[in-house]
């Protein structure tokens, strides 16, 4: 779809997703958080910005965190626990990935790290740097969805953030329920939203 001229003008006034992704990647690396190395952010202009793209170095031999969801392998149990520690560490640093899906966290084995596993963030343009409180952190963690080793995910997160496991588990289950309800409503109203052009 061709963007509305007013939308193109408004999008030109704010920084592009490509430029935001580049800036966020540099900041994450400065904080010691792994992300593919940023190489360039390119914007094309013809009066208004007509396009933008972000280039980064590709991580080879990495899998996505969503692959840990249904994995019954004991290595997945440890990797899921380490994922909880990683997300807790991000929140302690004030990093909030507002699109924290299992596809936007890469997982790689690394015996040289204390956890034996390393993680890397992608799809960076929706990351915000802010103070992440308990409730906001658990709501963000719930975006990842349910894992076979959810107890290990929460244990790692609680350990890193020094939270009460019982409170965290209760809040996490509540947030998962809210997300399921929201997703059900969202998918159920899709035909109406399309009809109305929303």
Q: Could you say what each language-model-derived stretch is?
A:
Residues 100-110:
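Hydrophobic residue at the +6 position relative to the catalytic HRD Asp in the kinase catalytic loop
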Residues 60, 102, 126:
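Short, glycine/acidic-enriched loop or turn micro-motifs at the edges of active sites
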Residues 117-196:
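C-lobe/activation-segment region of protein kinase-like
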Residues 1-63, 85-93, 97:
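Conserved ATP-binding subdomain of kinase catalytic cores across diverse folds
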Residues 11-18, 73-77, 134:
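Flexible, glycine- and charge-enriched loops at secondary-structure boundaries
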Residues 48-52, 113-118:
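A short, glycine/Asx- and small/polar-enriched loop/turn
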Residues 64-73:
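AlphaC helix of the protein kinase catalytic domain
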Residues 75-86:
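Conserved alphaE helix
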């Amino acid at each position: 779809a061709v963007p509305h001229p007013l939308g193109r003008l408004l999008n030109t006034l704010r920084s592009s997703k490509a430029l935001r992704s580049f800036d966020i990647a540099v900041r994450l690396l400065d904080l010691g958080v792994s992300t593919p190395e940023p190489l360039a952010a390119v914007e094309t202009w013809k009066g208004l910005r007509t396009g933008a793209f972000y280039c980064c170095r590709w991580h080879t031999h990495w899998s996505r965190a969503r692959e840990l969801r249904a994995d019954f392998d004991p290595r997945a149990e440890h990797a899921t626990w380490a994922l909880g520690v990683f997300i807790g560490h991000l929140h302690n640093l004030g990093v909030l990935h507002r699109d924290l899906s299992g596809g936007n966290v890469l997982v790689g084995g690394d015996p040289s790290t204390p956890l034996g596993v390393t993680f890397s963030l992608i799809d960076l343009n929706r990351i915000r740097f802010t103070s992440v409180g308990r409730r906001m952190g658990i709501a963000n963690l719930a975006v990842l969805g349910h894992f076979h080793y959810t107890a290990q995910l929460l244990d790692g997160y609680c350990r890193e953030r020094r939270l009460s496991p019982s409170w965290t588990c209760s809040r996490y289950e509540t947030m998962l329920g809210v997300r399921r309800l929201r997703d059900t409503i969202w998918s159920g109203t899709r035909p109406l939203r399309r009809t109305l052009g929303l």
